[in-house]
Design a protein with these regions (language model features):
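Cysteine endopeptidase catalytic domains of the caspase/legumain-like
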Residues: 1-144
Length: 144
């Protein structure tokens, strides 16, 4: 099915251009196979995307939640109605990540919830990657 792949892929350079053109703080949720930023030592990164994220973060802040490392598949199950990552994000915003019980979802608590939940759903075969620096202001109000 690779003949159809270019229609579904978004090159890192295109994402980088889009990110650099945005105003204000931003949060991104990327649920695709091999979606990670690969911030771990020894792993390759997309230099354009990494540069764009660093530039945005210096100026106004950015948070990126990616469903898996750059070397992993993002798992799906028909019973979930989504991938494991999207399922965990939805559950987290609906209250699973409201650890303080104050109605606010923060990047740090969403990261913790999503990572644990995805690892549980995928039997530790998928590890989300979260890129954020110094931002822990609420990003959502708990949904009902």
């Amino acid at each position: 099915k690779l003949k159809n792949a270019p229609k579904r892929w978004v090159p890192g350079e295109e994402i980088a251009r889009t990110l650099l053109g945005l105003k204000g703080r931003s949060a991104f949720f990327i649920d695709t196979c091999h979606s990670g930023i690969n911030a771990r030592p020894g792993q390759s990164t997309n230099p354009d995307l990494t540069k764009a994220l660093n530039e945005i973060n210096e100026e106004r802040g950015v948070i990126v939640f990616a469903s898996s490392t750059g070397k992993e598949l993002s798992q799906e199950d028909p019973a979930w109605g989504n991938g494991a990552f999207t399922k965990a994000i939805i559950e987290g915003i609906r209250g699973g990540a409201d650890f303080r019980k104050d109605g606010l979802i923060r990047p740090s608590t969403l990261q913790s919830y999503v990572t644990d939940r995805v690892m549980e759903l995928t039997k530790k075969e998928q590890r989300p990657v979260i890129f954020t620096v110094g931002i822990d202001e609420p990003i959502a109000v708990r949904g009902q």
